[in-house]
């Protein structure tokens, strides 16, 4: 009887231990519902906010069985774009699509993000995908962001970078005195060739052009359509300076670490899908704009010569990369490594000697 009693007691402890293990197991923890805030870089009505990001949010909620719910907030609703980085670090917001170039002063790898590359580095979606996702640039940036308390979900294609104007800009020579809203290396390029670049949030640009504060603007092609810049800028200048422009998907490390591994894997997969989906929709809708909307709006497409493209590449873009390596490289060796990767890529494609 004593043996039987001991066996029964042991079985009770085993069963209790089993249920305790279940209650503490990842499977039980996985039942927790997480609520995230997404701060978008773009405004309501834009391609990302109306299509791309909502699809991401819906996909993640469905794939997690409702365990991760994300609420989208438009540009400036939670914090201004300049405050997204510290807000992520503090876990005030949990996820953001933004441009790391805005913090290139404090995070050196911001200088080698796709959004900050000078003109004519990559010249197709496939080239961008190769350079960032397969030649190691995203890996370098992920390491740097981790040191800042931010988890990096990769660079994503947001469409080609053009600029547009109230007056014809037929060549580089016409840039002198041109007051333009631009960003990062695009602003640096404009300044090099005599223009006067200004950085303004997207919602303020239309009025600035209307009142004469600006002569034009430059960014992703769809901003021309979605912000109705065609009403104030009838001249649209190509070829695109960045093919494509890209941004980064950043997550608060604190929020990331709180997630079960399966939800982390779902987010990683959803980020890859988002980049591909963004690239596809960009190509489809951009061509629709040229084919159907330009005639209706009265927009004139001005195509610069190959000579201008070659001059920008050799006179500005290549020296700019070397300057970044020399001046920013000592702050983070990943910047030097990144520039080496970029220049080798350009040699492989015959863009530089």
Please give the residue ranges for each predicted region:
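N-terminal secretory signal peptides that target proteins for export/translocation
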Residues: 1-6
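Bacterial N-terminal signal peptides
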Residues: 9-23
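Sec/Tat signal peptide C-region and signal peptidase I cleavage site
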Residues: 24-29
């Amino acid at each position: 009887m004593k043996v039987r009693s001991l066996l029964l007691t042991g079985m009770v402890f085993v069963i209790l231990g089993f249920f305790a293990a279940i209650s503490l197991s990842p499977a039980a923890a996985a039942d927790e519902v997480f609520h995230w805030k997404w701060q978008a870089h773009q405004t309501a009505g834009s391609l990302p906010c109306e299509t791309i990001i909502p699809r991401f949010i819906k996909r993640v909620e469905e794939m997690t069985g409702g365990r991760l719910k994300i609420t989208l907030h438009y540009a400036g609703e939670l914090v201004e774009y300049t405050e997204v980085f510290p807000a992520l670090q503090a876990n005030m917001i949990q996820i953001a699509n933004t441009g790391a170039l805005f913090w290139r002063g404090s995070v050196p790898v911001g200088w080698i993000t796709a959004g900050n590359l000078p003109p004519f580095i990559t010249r197709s979606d496939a080239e961008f995908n190769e350079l960032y996702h397969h030649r190691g640039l995203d890996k370098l940036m992920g390491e740097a962001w981790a040191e800042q308390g931010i988890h990096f979900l990769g660079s994503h294609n947001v469409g080609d970078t053009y600029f547009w104007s109230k007056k014809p800009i037929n060549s580089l020579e016409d840039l002198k005195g041109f007051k333009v809203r631009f960003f990062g290396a695009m602003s640096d390029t404009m300044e090099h060739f005599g223009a006067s670049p200004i950085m303004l949030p997207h919602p303020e640009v239309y009025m600035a052009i209307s009142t004469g504060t600006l002569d034009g603007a430059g960014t992703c092609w769809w901003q021309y359509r979605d912000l109705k810049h065609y009403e104030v800028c009838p001249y649209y200048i190509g070829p695109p300076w960045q093919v494509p422009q890209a941004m980064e998907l950043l997550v608060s490390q604190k929020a990331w670490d709180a997630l079960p591994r399966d939800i982390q894997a779902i987010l990683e997969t959803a980020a890859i899908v988002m980049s591909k989906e963004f690239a596809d929709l960009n190509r489809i809708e951009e061509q629709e704009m040229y084919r159907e909307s330009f005639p209706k709006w009265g927009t004139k497409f001005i195509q610069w010569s190959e000579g201008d493209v070659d001059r920008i590449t050799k006179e500005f873009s290549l020296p700019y990369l070397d300057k970044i390596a020399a001046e920013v490289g000592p702050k983070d060796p990943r910047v030097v490594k990144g520039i080496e990767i970029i220049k080798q890529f350009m040699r492989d494609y015959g863009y530089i000697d």
